[in-house]
Amino acid sequence: MALADRLLAAWYAGHPALALLRPLEALYRRVVTRKRARFLSGESASYRAPVPVIVVGNITIGGTGKTPMILWLIEHCRRQGLKVGVVSRGYGAEPPRLPWRVEAIQSAEQAGDEPLLIVQRTGVPLMIDPDRSRAVQALLASEPLDLILCDDGMQHYRLARDLELVLIDAARGLGNGRCLPAGPLREPAERLQEVDAVLFNGASADRPEGFAFHLQPSALVNLRTGERRALDFFPAGQRLHAVAGIGNPQRFFNTLLGLNWQPVPHPFADHAQFSAQSLAFSPSLPLVMTEKDAVKCRAFAADDWWYLAVEALPTPAFCGWFDSQLQRLLPGHRTP
């Protein structure tokens, strides 16, 4: 197990050695708290876009289902007749220049895996740049939009936001509740009291402190042909290789178990790069991976490689709340 994976496991399971990192945690907390205070006071300048900006992110290290939720938000806003754009850091991307407009035909190396997935799924205009405010300005200069979704960027205070949605893995919660490097928190837990909504991935019902949503498997999609198959394509008990290079691989493996398959788990680091050699497993079995990983593997995929398409399903209470926020942010807009 890599050092990063061991540290992640310790943050969520607890380990006495983490106490040694508390002096560094105290320093980290002071830095992030002062940074936020400077922007709130106006001491540090932030850019406010001429259209509403909704930040979708988390305060923890590790997967929370952010990309499926962004896909849901895009489609939901479109059903309201809104023109939506997305900005993202583009983690791991190596574009020719910044900001960079992501197109569906680009490679994951150039565009980043999550931005490419979003564009291939939705065709939404999407700009990547670690400087999210610059990405927003470039996106708005390229075409008229009603609304901007910021993929992650909770801690990027240079971009002013009108709504903050924070996602949390309901099973793992906030881990040991401590900030980096003694725990998984990017910001102190008190930050949750300031956001507009908290969504718990995998919660069985809404809570007083936030809304529930879950990820629903919808189909198997062949990497080479794009063919979609129902989830009963594999019989119960089917053994298969399971590949997940995401923030919480075990959630993906548990999903496959819940479909009554027998996955042989192959966890990789989040945003890992793949090759035919790194995925040449024995024995020979069908291979199922996440959609985020699939965008990096189509060029060398075998005939029996599939990805599991999933959809985010928030509760009716969240849908109603979110629609009320859209009406507040865009009072002149009429739903078709």
Curated annotation (Swiss-Prot):
Domain of life: Bacteria
GO cellular component: plasma membrane
Residues binding ATP, per UniProt: T60, I61, G62, G63, T64, G65, K66, T67
Catalytic activity line of the entry: a lipid A disaccharide + ATP = a lipid IVA + ADP + H(+)
Alphabetized Pfam families for the sequence: LpxK (PF02606)
The enzyme's E.C. designation: 2.7.1.130
InterPro entries per record: LpxK (IPR003758), P-loop_NTPase (IPR027417)
Keywords, comma-separated and alphabetical: ATP-binding, Kinase, Lipid A biosynthesis, Lipid biosynthesis, Lipid metabolism, Nucleotide-binding, Transferase
Any one GO BP annotation for this protein: lipid A biosynthetic process
Gene Ontology molecular function: any one: tetraacyldisaccharide 4'-kinase activity
Pathway listed: Glycolipid biosynthesis; lipid IV(A) biosynthesis; lipid IV(A) from (3R)-3-hydroxytetradecanoyl-[acyl-carrier-protein] and UDP-N-acetyl-alpha-D-glucosamine: step 6/6
Protein task: Transfers the gamma-phosphate of ATP to the 4'-position of a tetraacyldisaccharide 1-phosphate intermediate (termed DS-1-P) to form tetraacyldisaccharide 1,4'-bis-phosphate (lipid IVA).
Family per similarity comment: Belongs to the LpxK family.
Protein name: Tetraacyldisaccharide 4'-kinase
Record organism: Pseudomonas putida (strain W619)
Taxonomic lineage of the native organism: Bacteria, Pseudomonadati, Pseudomonadota, Gammaproteobacteria, Pseudomonadales
Gene assigned in the entry: lpxK
